[in-house]
From Swiss-Prot:
One GO MF term: structural constituent of ribosome
PANTHER family from the UniProt entry: LARGE RIBOSOMAL SUBUNIT PROTEIN UL13M, RIBOSOMAL PROTEIN L13
Keywords: Acetylation, Mitochondrion, Ribonucleoprotein, Ribosomal protein
Name this polypeptide is given: Large ribosomal subunit protein uL13m
Lineage, broadest ranks: Eukaryota, Fungi, Dikarya, Ascomycota, Saccharomycotina
Amino acid sequence: MSQKIGHSGLAFARLWHHVDVARDKRTLGRLASAIAITLIGRHKPVYHPSQDCGDYVVVTNCQKIRVTGKKFEQKTYWSHSGRPGQLKLQTMNKVVADKGFGEILKKAVSGMLPKNKLRKQRLDRLKVFDGSENPYKQNITAFAHEQSSIPEPLKESIFNQLK
């Protein structure tokens, strides 16, 4: 039997994925579920529910997000402080006017993440932008429409750490 442990450092390395909503044809829910899987790390071979091995996700062009039906006028987001009479209801239009289209995507992804202690850390790795410009361009190593691959400098640094 082989005693080789393998290069698990490559599997645990956090990659930066880029999702361009303008190029992506998926609706809000389908896009949010794919992003949630990447943030959780379920696409990795070393995934375990108790470990946070997910990747970063940068989403651009959120203003081009697709929703079906009349959700912009009819879907409501609610929050409650716990005190009587403090229920706050906001339509999707109001949320977009106040905080932008990225907030809608963040709320959708947040609802698809497990409700545990790792949720906030995973949401912090989601970076959303209404336009096409973002400050993380140099970090992005994987694109939503491509097979994810590990860049050579990252491979070399991880292999050097393992030696």
